[in-house]
């Protein structure tokens, strides 16, 4: 076999390896998101059970969607679609006043899918108060699950991990950024740094 034929054979072999590698990667990526809705529903149900088992004494809380908070419990209230789960990682300081729906807040946050894929953030890795950046936005401008959590935070420096079902997140449609699939349970690590109400900022 001459050198020219050897060169062609080598190129064919490399092409086959590359194609096989791409195919394997695609399969792995696709399989992770197979039955995504069912997997996310199960994941939130498990977190809800854990929160109830651990209890508020251990820093776990279950809160109803802010828009349903004052409504009586009826058969139309779906526990797995109308609640968020909160794990208090650290309690902050200050008064028991809390942000309102029309207030602006200053937060550090990291948004993740159930598999810990980070789709939005203003800090990376473990939260470090000396390094994390902050963002300002109005409470009513975020998804219901995020807004519900913010309106339950009563201390500057409250540091929570918040779990929300897709119904209180981005719903049954894929996000426009293409990074959040439809029916995604979301996890947000949130640190409340302050909020703006009645014409003034409340900060630590």
Give the predicted meaning of each segment:
Residues 7-14:
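Sec-dependent signal peptide hydrophobic core
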Residues 2-6, 22-204:
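Cross-family detector of peptidyl-prolyl cis-trans isomerase
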Residues 17-21:
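C-terminal motif of bacterial Sec signal peptides marking the signal peptidase cleavage site
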């Amino acid at each position: 076999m001459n050198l020219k034929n050897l060169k062609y054979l080598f190129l064919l072999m490399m092409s086959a390896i590359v194609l096989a590698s791409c195919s394997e990667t695609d399969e792995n990526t696709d399989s992770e998101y197979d039955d995504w809705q069912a997997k996310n529903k199960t994941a939130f149900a498990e977190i809800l059970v854990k929160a109830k088992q651990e209890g508020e004494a251990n820093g776990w809380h279950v809160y109803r969607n802010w828009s349903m908070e004052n409504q009586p419990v009826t058969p139309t209230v779906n526990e797995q679609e109308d609640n968020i789960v909160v794990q208090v990682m650290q309690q902050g300081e200050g008064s028991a006043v809390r942000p309102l729906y029309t207030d602006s807040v200053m937060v550090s946050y990291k948004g993740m899918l159930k598999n810990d894929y980070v789709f939005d953030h203003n800090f990376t890795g473990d939260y470090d108060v000396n390094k994390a950046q902050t963002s300002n936005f109005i409470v009513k401008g975020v998804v219901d699950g995020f807004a519900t959590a913010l309106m339950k935070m009563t201390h500057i420096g409250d540091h929570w991990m918040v779990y929300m079902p897709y119904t209180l997140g981005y719903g049954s449609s894929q996000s426009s950024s293409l990074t959040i699939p439809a029916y995604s349970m979301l996890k947000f690590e949130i640190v409340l740094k302050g909020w703006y109400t009645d014409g003034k900022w409340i900060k630590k």
